[in-house]
Amino acid sequence: MLPEQQQQLISLIQAAVASVLPDAQAQVLLERPKVAAHGDVATNIAMQLAKPARRNPRELAQGIVDALMAETAARALVENAEIAGPGFINFRITAAARQAVIQAVAEQGEAYGHAPATGEKVLVEFVSANPTGPLHVGHARQAALGDAICRLYAATGRDVTREFYYNDAGNQIQNLAVSVQARARGIAPDSPDYPADGYKGDYIVDIAQDFIARKTLQAADGAAVTASGDVDNLDDIRVFAVAYLRREQDLDLQAFGLAFDNYYLESSLYTSGRVEQTVQALVAKGHTYEQDGALWLRTTELGTGDDKDRVMRKSEGGYTYFVPDVAYHKAKWERGFRHAVNIQGSDHHGTVARVRAGLQALEEGIPKDYPAYVLHKMVKVMRGGEEVKISKRAGSYVTLRDLIDWVGRDAVRYFLIQRRADTEFVFDIDLALSKSDENPVYYIQYAHARICSMIANAGADDARIAQADTALLTAPTEFALMQRLASFPQIVAQAAQELAPHHIAFWLRDCASDFHAWYNAERVLVDDEPLKLARLRLAATTRQVLANGLALLGVSAPQRM
């Protein structure tokens, strides 16, 4: 059912309940029966009300049904209503109500499944890689999840900002600089003179060569940087190496079809004084204490679930890594983002309570669950039945660029979204390359391309198809397909609410399956011209909604394959 049809049916049921039990107070909820033969939607409202009303639930259900079906508006929407089990009411909607989705999609087009603008600002931070190497498969999963979540937020009316937080401060940047310096001096990774914690991928050689050649380069949001070529100047090497890798990451993200609205540098939190100001504010508010020469935050007293207090400033000096995180998220709040989402690897689980505790200590008005988190698990890449662990470019891990080069952007995006973020995932390269029904990307895109080909070969112009009589669409597989198309707006809303784009991936696979089942059961290009046009109209409707769903995942909808 379309969302507006569901709301209409809920209102009609509420009116029927009021006529049977004038003083009753209960929320009417509709759900799809687990067995399709039981109906299209069902409610347990009679079971909710039976005990407080001291009524038999089945008898109460019958009274509600009688009152409901006495209304003309209800009969236009509901073909029949049956009592099942202890008091469920199962509804089967009319053919006209099923067919209404075709006109709805025709009127809304690319906006079908979308909601009006709410004006709510949302900041989604994701990828946020250290500028110390190419983006790996974990970053790839973040990129796919993050961009899809942003698209879902936009589809549900939010004003979305995509942000990349660069971890450009700390020991890893120093390790990068000395690694490039060693390579620039001709020291190989297998040499005892190579830095013990140095990076060893081929990209370090590329940086060293460009530094010596005094190349000029520019990241997406930064000023141009020209290498000095002075291999003894570690600061120059560090600045150039960071700029080089930021540019490389930008290029990888461009190849993935992803553009960020804003870049935020961790180093700016120190140069602007935000980190020190944050610490001073926490001390002034009485949420810290000194012990063993270190400064501690009383995180256990701040109601965010942390099981022990945390060190902020180490006894030997320097802040722990969660302190700049607190300063950064306070900045998000001050920038007006009352809704913020972080997409990170599951190894960041321990930081959630600490960051939230720091925010609680800084400002009472910040909700305890701010920011929201989507924590994803690892991705294992398989090829030929064996795990792929090594990339020549990165040296020790498979990169985002590797995946794009091997299977293409569409497959990478879909495969990395199709499972819940909190589950480990095996990326099967062979499956992603296969042209079979087992490959979900191929299966869905083939359905779209098949429809394009079918309509092109039908010899009917768009105007005639658009005016076709949908009342002729009464086959069971047609009803099933229309029901699937009508469910799309609810799936979009659910996926956005739960920050779970895999719901869209599942829905697309199911929709393609329903389309193929209909296509195989009912000839579309029949001799009966009105029926042919009606079926072409259903096919065109399916094509539009498939394209809308694929767009939410950042996946293309090809016209031919």
Swiss-Prot record:
Signal peptide as annotated in the record: none
InterPro entries: aa-tRNA-synth_I_CS, Arg-tRNA-ligase, Arg-tRNA-synth_N, Arg-tRNA-synth_N_sf, ArgRS_core, DALR_anticod-bd, Rossmann-like_a/b/a_fold, tRNAsynth_Ia_anticodon-bd
Primary localization: cytoplasm
Taxonomic source organism: Bordetella petrii (strain ATCC BAA-461 / DSM 12804 / CCUG 43448)
Superkingdom: Bacteria
GO molecular function annotation: arginine-tRNA ligase activity; ATP binding
Key words, A-Z: Aminoacyl-tRNA synthetase, ATP-binding, Cytoplasm, Ligase, Nucleotide-binding, Protein biosynthesis
Name of the protein this chain belongs to: Arginine--tRNA ligase
Record-level GO cellular component terms: cytoplasm
